Amino acid sequence: MITPLDAHGNIDYNATNILIKYLEGINVDYLFPMGSTGVFPYFTLKERKDFLKFVRENSKKPIMAGVGSSSINEVNELMKFSMDIGIEAAVLMPPYYIKLNQEAIYHYYKEILSSNDMDLLIYNIPQFTNKIDPETVKNLKSEFSSVKGVKDSSADIRGFMEMLSLSDDDFAVFQGQDDLLFTSLELGASGGVCGTTNFSDGIVRLYHEYKNNREMALKIEKNDVIPLMKKLGKYQFPNAYYEYFYKKNNINGGYRPPMYRVGIEI
Amino acid sequence: MITPLDAHGNIDYNATNILIKYLEGINVDYLFPMGSTGVFPYFTLKERKDFLKFVRENSKKPIMAGVGSSSINEVNELMKFSMDIGIEAAVLMPPYYIKLNQEAIYHYYKEILSSNDMDLLIYNIPQFTNKIDPETVKNLKSEFSSVKGVKDSSADIRGFMEMLSLSDDDFAVFQGQDDLLFTSLELGASGGVCGTTNFSDGIVRLYHEYKNNREMALKIEKNDVIPLMKKLGKYQFPNAYYEYFYKKNNINGGYRPPMYRVGIEI
Amino acid sequence: MITPLDAHGNIDYNATNILIKYLEGINVDYLFPMGSTGVFPYFTLKERKDFLKFVRENSKKPIMAGVGSSSINEVNELMKFSMDIGIEAAVLMPPYYIKLNQEAIYHYYKEILSSNDMDLLIYNIPQFTNKIDPETVKNLKSEFSSVKGVKDSSADIRGFMEMLSLSDDDFAVFQGQDDLLFTSLELGASGGVCGTTNFSDGIVRLYHEYKNNREMALKIEKNDVIPLMKKLGKYQFPNAYYEYFYKKNNINGGYRPPMYRVGIEI
Amino acid sequence: MITPLDAHGNIDYNATNILIKYLEGINVDYLFPMGSTGVFPYFTLKERKDFLKFVRENSKKPIMAGVGSSSINEVNELMKFSMDIGIEAAVLMPPYYIKLNQEAIYHYYKEILSSNDMDLLIYNIPQFTNKIDPETVKNLKSEFSSVKGVKDSSADIRGFMEMLSLSDDDFAVFQGQDDLLFTSLELGASGGVCGTTNFSDGIVRLYHEYKNNREMALKIEKNDVIPLMKKLGKYQFPNAYYEYFYKKNNINGGYRPPMYRVGIEI
């Protein structure tokens, strides 16, 4: 989920409601507020809580909430809050800013997992923060039963296959790059956490077609998903996702710096 | 300044006081709390304010406060708070996590500079966050008189020279890498913002010797600063800075994950 | 194909013959001498010609010859030589050493394609030399009918999909990374150019099973190919490929620096 | 030295003579044919020998010859040839194309140094080929007295300082980046191997002024060298160096692909 903004750069809850209804309509399995496409680092802790609360109160879909922060105190606070309001799962990437080795990343997750029982997806997105190695994921998974899977947005299929080798009935591996979903399903991925759902149903159709009609799924990937991803990829991430959503829904949306309006045609 | 921690990973104000007194004793010109060595992203907004306030109340040295956050709301809040309590200047790097182009970085600074009058140092540290180009610094400097300089920790001397070309009476360029201070002074740098000051006076002596005794300054660089930086550089940043400080002062200090204790000898 | 070496680091033609017979036995479609696994840059022009000639004279399999060099004169000489001795196709990566933009790469291929009629595969391997963009491949393909396809060893599936979008009856797209062959076939790849063939038939079985028994192919990938690639990947490339081949065939093989013997168990 | 080319992309010896006379006129200490600016990888072994021979026969200046190749046989041949014709020293970077660890690089140099007595400069240029660590340089220096120094073109001052720590009466450390020469001299560099000498005497004047008039040297760096380097840096390397030389001397010069003409104004 993007985090819709008004002309002043504040969260726009009317627009958020439109987004929630759209996502329910195209039949996603989970809502994922405050992820990277939701530009979570651009908001205060209070804004993040308010947004999670609004999504919870306005949808019956299961929710996985982005709880990322380099500060373990903030992560703990967001996890407890999310659990209290009935959110089903949390999604957490390694800390950002300071470059970290795997030992540091392990200490971070261990501390958080030791003080929270909430189901957690580990989020690997090395473009934006420190990479978590499959080996570290494996160790955390073996020590904490609340670690329920991984969302891998690395776009590195070799690394993704290593994550997939950890899959079992209690451990899911999700692809975070829309244009790699078909390939990932072929290799055994549990599903996708995909940003184009904010304004397009192609990726959901691909996912649902896949089981019965592999050829059709591949066709959707090639004809719908890849061209859309290429188009979005020409702009500073994730500004085009917002503009696309605003334009499609005739919303007078805005941007909070460092975000800015880009000229994508829909 | 590191942010000294106790055995539970909370800020240790007794230790902070020891640190302040040491820095005053070796005669630094400014205190710089909540920078990268101070692991500012590992703290909550409240912890950051409390720490800034403590430093302000316990030293008469001028202070430049790290106010970094990807959230402009948090930056604005930290700047207003800092100004209110009498802190002299703020230090701000570009937003982290999402990879940004220069246009995005410009929008971010512009928004913040438009709503704050506090003197600001721009902080370039591309190892940890998006790089700010000298061209963007130049544009911001020409539009906002509150932009008083840049702290460059890139370790890229060619880029540093480009920053130096912006120097004038109202614009200072500081070197953020201790082992490059001598070279930077030769090229015209205004000074350094140097992490080894937390437990060693070599870099301050180098700076003061430089004007009168260039050879002595070079000797300190080669014999004291570079070997110390190499030793510290063997460990996950900035854990060794903390351990060094704890050991030197016989403090039973601690770590907040992702930080952890490393075995440096002092 | 590796380029088998004797204890003095010279090409070992007896061992080469053993290799040719093995490759024929496991039923590869083409032989590919003097590629990256064949460490072509470690040989003189004369050694390269001699090796190509030996392979040509000792096998009736179609051959694609690595003709890479940053010097267009050397490439032209190798292509003419290869064509004269009846080699079916050439494989050529962009020039290495000096970092090049796409315009430079285009000029290089254009010059070579204008003076040679031999069928050519473009070789994308950005780990080792300048990357060639799908757009540049597309331009070369549209101008020169002798451009018959691309070998992509980038391990970047997103880029590979872009290459695949150029596929047609006269343009083949090959995967150069063994552990990505299954995935690539799913996406429509024409086949693979795979280094583990030097001592293992898994990847060939995978390829042949794929058309009739996709599940079996996936099983081979997971049980045979990926574990083998991981094992090989622990050593300085491509030393372990050589040692594996030597040990398997009880050959007293050697290395030419910068190659050296590694301790892989087979 | 660039390698001047005629309109057909062949070496232009008349132009080479003009270049030699110019370099003698501005009083460089050494000629350095077949380095990176000389695009040595774009030539055949015979062309490289012919060029070295021509330079030797047409100048009494000491010469250091670029003998780089990933093939140790080619390096050995070039070194023996150079020694035979009276060239004073060889310059050699680590092998390119295949990514190598330090052990591989060590094996390569060791093999070459064991079979040649010629004085050698190790050439570090990680932008174009595998990086050689100061530690590896140190080991080679301690084992082979023919290792007389290092040319470092990395533009990494921290690494350069590590190379400088190896300096002694028998081991020189040269800066390969013109705009970093002043800084490097300050730190104790032996001198520079600088590409702008092909058409400009600024860097030579800087070097000669440095000993007596440090301020003048710094002025030349800021007013002449840095602006020239910035201008050249806007184009695909090293095309602008060639065009500049051609234009300045009214030579109808050419390019061998992947080189091409760029529109620099002189």
Swiss-Prot record, chains A, B, C, D:
Substrate binds at residues 36-37, 123-125, 151-153. Keywords: Carbohydrate metabolism, Lyase, Schiff base. It comes from Picrophilus torridus (strain ATCC 700027 / DSM 9790 / JCM 10055 / NBRC 100828 / KAW 2/3). This is 2-dehydro-3-deoxy-D-gluconate/2-dehydro-3-deoxy-phosphogluconate aldolase. Pfam families: DHDPS (PF00701). Involved in the degradation of glucose via the Entner-Doudoroff pathway. Catalyzes the reversible cleavage of 2-keto-3-deoxy-6-phosphogluconate (KDPG) and 2-keto-3-deoxygluconate (KDG) forming pyruvate and glyceraldehyde 3-phosphate or glyceraldehyde, respectively. It is also able to catalyze the reversible cleavage of 2-keto-3-deoxy-6-phosphogalactonate (KDPGal) and 2-keto-3-deoxygalactonate (KDGal). It is equally active with both D- and L-glyceraldehyde. It comes from the Archaea. Its EC number is 4.1.2.14, 4.1.2.51, 4.1.2.-, 4.1.2.21. Optimum temperature is 65 degrees Celsius. It shows high thermostability. At 70 degrees Celsius, the enzyme does not lose activity upon incubation for 2 hours. The half-lives of the enzyme at 80 degrees Celsius and 90 degrees Celsius are 20 minutes and 15 minutes, respectively. Coiled coil: none annotated. The record marks 123 as: Proton shuttle. Belongs to the DapA family. KDPG aldolase subfamily. Homotetramer; dimer of dimers. It is an enzyme of class 4 (lyase). It catalyses: 2-dehydro-3-deoxy-6-phospho-D-gluconate = D-glyceraldehyde 3-phosphate + pyruvate; 2-dehydro-3-deoxy-D-gluconate = D-glyceraldehyde + pyruvate; 2-dehydro-3-deoxy-6-phospho-D-galactonate = D-glyceraldehyde 3-phosphate + pyruvate; 2-dehydro-3-deoxy-D-galactonate = D-glyceraldehyde + pyruvate. GO terms for molecular function: 2-dehydro-3-deoxy-6-phosphogalactonate aldolase activity; 2-dehydro-3-deoxy-D-gluconate aldolase activity; 2-dehydro-3-deoxy-phosphogluconate aldolase activity; 4-hydroxy-tetrahydrodipicolinate synthase activity; aldehyde-lyase activity. InterPro entries: Aldolase_TIM (IPR013785), DapA-like (IPR002220), Schiff_base-form_aldolases_AS (IPR020625). GO terms for biological process: glucose catabolic process.
